[in-house]
């Protein structure tokens, strides 16, 4: 096992990365190794997808499957070894079908890629794990060095984050052939074990630029189906009655669940990154979408244990449900998996609803505590002139984009302290689950404009980018000249690709934490600092002083 993709990876003087019987996320060495094997199979599939496009062959089954299966290897998504192998088998079957299509056009069709003809050696998980050793990401570290390995992983993990957003968009009916062609090209190239530093750096920026387009179609999918988010108050306390909790990012799953629970007497609560769903008109119209439950994903083993109903996980993040003994009432959907947990293959939630009706639910309603969400792209752009006016009248000094992933590391209290230290004449724009560090606190307003503005999920960084570009255009300056600072927390691969997106768009002087990614060496961090001004957090006082004086 070698895995260094998330923020909680093991760090030692000898090197970074989880390489024992189990990773810090709870992923076993077996599952981790089989995910490496799956990635190799997907790289071979992409190699043939690139070749097929040369012949004008575009196989939509391949295009939809590839990023979805890649998404299953993202942190805290799928811990179920047999399902990972199932994805690998499906990848090979699709590859062979695509290969046959190519050969039907050109009998001499060939692909020069080491993954292009990969076959699984056995049905036995142990033998497959041994085969997977050929594809361990750091297998040639001694030959290429830590810097090249780090850049490879930056590209691989960034592309994995983009693949997750591609799947979220595809679920909502969004498909862009150019994006998929670019995805396959990059995925196939990474399967050749590239070792050119400049080419890898260029690739990382290409992934960021591609992901901006992915976020654009995801935004179109969400707003096209569910309307543009508008500011909405959400109760974060319990309402009496039977209940279901839904977590993850998949708004379509939430919509289907709301439709199927309507009139059943079962209330629905959002968790984690589902919180922004309350801002969408076509979702909040369901009166039994009663509120948001819990805090950051890392607290779920305590909070889920206390929730008196079933739980549905639609995407990341799931962690071991046996710890809180709620594994008999947590359900996985789509690419999510945990051994022994019931999985919903389709969009029928009747079994979950039946379980909710058999459980006690919340016995009484607590005193409501309301927070505000729903500052989507349209709302943010509508406020652009107000922001400019407040800045011109010196009522608004600075905007801090304070968001990203949450996690368990104690140093993450930095983000709570930072939020509460932001001066009263400054505004906080937040997104993603890092907001749970401070989103239930009171921040007041500036002439009626809330000082805490929740823009949505991690992918809604797109809205923040569009706002920044709009403000810069209206003020006749560059984005980096705005009174705007980005202080971002990271945990997994979606955060990595958001960072690459920002860097590829030329955004500079981003501050990140709580730690630097374990796969980035001091040399690589120095390069990123020199090129983009990217740096790690220090202390709240020092960072605040520096950002306000910039």
Curated annotation (Swiss-Prot):
Modified residues (Cysteine persulfide): 405
Compartment(s) where it occurs, according to its Swiss-Prot or TrEMBL record: Cytoplasm
Top EC class, one word: oxidoreductase
Recorded superkingdom: Bacteria
EC number(s) per entry: 1.7.99.1
Residues that coordinate or bind [2Fe-2S] cluster: 3, 6, 18, 25
Cofactor entry: [2Fe-2S] cluster; hybrid [4Fe-2O-2S] cluster
Cofactor: how bound: Binds 1 [2Fe-2S] cluster.
Physiological role: Catalyzes the reduction of hydroxylamine to form NH(3) and H(2)O.
Official protein name in the record: Hydroxylamine reductase
Organism: Escherichia coli O139:H28 (strain E24377A / ETEC)
